[in-house]
């Protein structure tokens, strides 16, 4: 596609930075993307890169191959855009290599999409934005939940029928909850940039703002004014569970000495463009034990409401205690049981919004749509997250944005936070 003036029938060649759980979820969602192909994977772990490329080929979503370096992938004329899905701590390094490859004339791209969060703190997020804008790339901020078909349909219908006749919605709630992430780096505050607030509140904080924003209007029409947050380590710093965690994730994860928060709640007061106050309540947890991952949202107005819960999937299976089998995640992500009455999320990549967001950003980079979310939106999310950490640390409500936000690093990320 590079250099083409007619993108109407062209397909976007996409390369992935990252080969883990998130990258594979995107690849699974790619089965519903007609505008692009997964053609490349780079990871510092060559074996994992090769495995992820093989996985993409097995799904028939592109003739993917593993690359020896990010520069090699950018230099390949078949690669038009990069999807950044690697660990948070590698974000700056990865983007710098992309930009250097472009500026040195080794390759070119039309766009770059970045998985949430954009970066670990405001300073790093601003650096990512500056680098990408310096080389004139189109941007896509990958926040799958706002692309969930249930979220989109619920929002559109409530605004069209309820808000149009009785007034705009005034309260939105969103939550993501499960029993903990797959990889050790997520649990290490210094690497990840925090705990569950940084890892998953980025979803919920944006979902509530998205729901409160009138369809077709920019997020800026609903402006954050005040933030109140709480964080806690409810489960994983308990001695028995800290020991289990260290055993499963390795000696570098020790929640008796350097815990991260496994629960966070945030209330965001917004002001609308017509001067009304509306509220967003966001919560997130690594200490939720249910059937598996639970995403939920609500939107409430004067005479209407909506609710969404991914575990209300419509399909349930029952297994008696006589059924024996290996532990797995074949019923639902972050699955916690294999017996009893269990919900099944039949197509998680669709239900959670991966398919729709990847299709959208392929179309954006082909010039067929305007981006719903850019890196500027990702930066705004990071600002809200860092304000939430400040509020939790200070134990009070803060005006948004607070002073010193650009230089702020959470105590969890410094390794100095102690649960109360």
Enumerate the language-model features and the residues they cover.
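Alpha-helix termini
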Residues: 3-6, 56-61, 99-111, 160-165, ...
